[in-house]
Each structure stands twice: as C-alpha cells, then as structure tokens.
A protein has these predicted regions:
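An active-site-proximal "capping" alpha-helix that borders the catalytic cofactor pocket
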Residues: 76-87
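Conserved catalytic cores of phosphodiester-cleaving nucleases, focusing on short active-site segments
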Residues: 36-67, 82-83
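Short Pro/Gly-enriched beta-strand edge/turn motifs at strand-loop
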Residues: 19-28
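Metal-dependent nuclease catalytic regions and adjoining charged, substrate-binding loops involved
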Residues: 85-168
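Short histidine-centered catalytic/ligand-binding loop motif
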Residues: 62-74, 120-125
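Single conserved hydrophobic/aromatic residue that forms the stacking wall/gate
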Residues: 1-8, 12
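Short N-terminal edge-element motif at the start of the domain
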Residues: 10, 14-17, 32-34
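A short catalytic or substrate-binding loop motif that flags glycine-/basic-rich loops and adjacent residues
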Residues: 5, 31-37
C-alpha cells in the first residue's frame, strides 16, 4: 500500500543518520541527565506487522559454526537490546525479534587471489530490553555516589587499578 511504501521510504532515508557517528539514534533522559545513543548497522521492516527489526552485523574468522550462545556474547545481545530500547524511546514500533548477520571468513580456501570469502549466517534473537531503564538508573546512582562501586574480576578498570596499587 501507499502507507507501507511511505513508511519504508522514511526508514530508508533515516538509515544513514542512524549509522552516522555523532548522530545515530539517541535520546536525552532529562530526569537522569544522560544522553544515550547508538549507531545501528541495519533496520529492516517486518512486512507482516510493519514493525522495525534491528539487525546487527558481526564478522569473524573461525573454524566451526558461528552462534550467539557463548557467554561473552551477552554483550552482543545487550547491544541489540539497547538499540531496540532506543528506537522504542523514539516512538518507533519495534519487533522483539532481531537478527545477527554473522559473516565467518573461510580459512581453507585453496588460493587467496586477493579475495576474502565468507559464509554468511543470519541468527534470530528474541530480545528483551526491559533491563535497560533500570540499568541506566543504577548507572546514574553509581555516578552520583560518593562511594566507589565494589571491584569486579570482569572489570578492566578494576584490574588496572589493582596493578597500579602494586607499584604504588
């Protein structure tokens, strides 16, 4: 229909802004005095319900199947959930289903010929952005606190501070 075509055209026009550094898609949270923004790789339209679908592109070169199930890939999932949250905060109707477009470099090609070949896999992920707002409030409380947060073994800054104390 004409309306669907117009919506798709609008999304297409905005894509470049959503991908551009220092623009992207963002929102100012006045009550927290924070500005949150991100640069989204791609936005698709679900033609069955006209909701936006967030797609994120990943590249690697490893043997075996690519997945999004490794413990460290929670950061990928959080990233896409923040993108969904940003679009919803900006008034867009966003599908819970998102996709990772994973490009895995093929290592066992017979010849290079100045060409990299990839196996491309599209991995669906049903995202849940309900944690984002509470996490931002927690972050703001931490920033406003007079006390430092507890150290974590997973924190690079904490590891750096521990090493500095050794020489201190």
């Amino acid at each position: 229909t004409q309306a669907e075509s117009s919506a798709a055209s609008d999304v297409y026009k905005r894509q470049e802004i959503w991908r551009t550094r220092n623009q992207g898609i963002g929102i100012e949270l006045k009550e927290l005095n924070l500005y949150i923004y991100g640069l989204v790789d791609d936005v698709w339209i679900n033609t069955k319900n006209d909701k936006l679908i967030i797609a994120d592109y990943k590249a690697t070169s490893k043997k075996g199947d690519v997945t999004i199930d490794a413990p460290w890939q929670i950061s990928y999932k959080r990233q896409i959930e923040i993108y969904q949250w940003l679009f919803r905060q900006n008034g867009f109707d966003v599908d819970d289903m998102s996709y990772f477009v994973y490009c895995n470099g093929i290592k066992d090609s017979k010849v290079f010929d100045n060409c990299l070949n990839f196996e491309v896999k599209i991995l669906p992920y049903k995202a849940n952005d309900s944690w984002v707002t509470p996490a931002l409030k927690e972050i703001k409380n931490c920033l406003n606190s007079d006390e430092l947060p507890e150290e974590s073994d997973r924190c690079d800054y904490c590891a750096y501070n521990r090493k500095i104390k050794l020489f201190g």
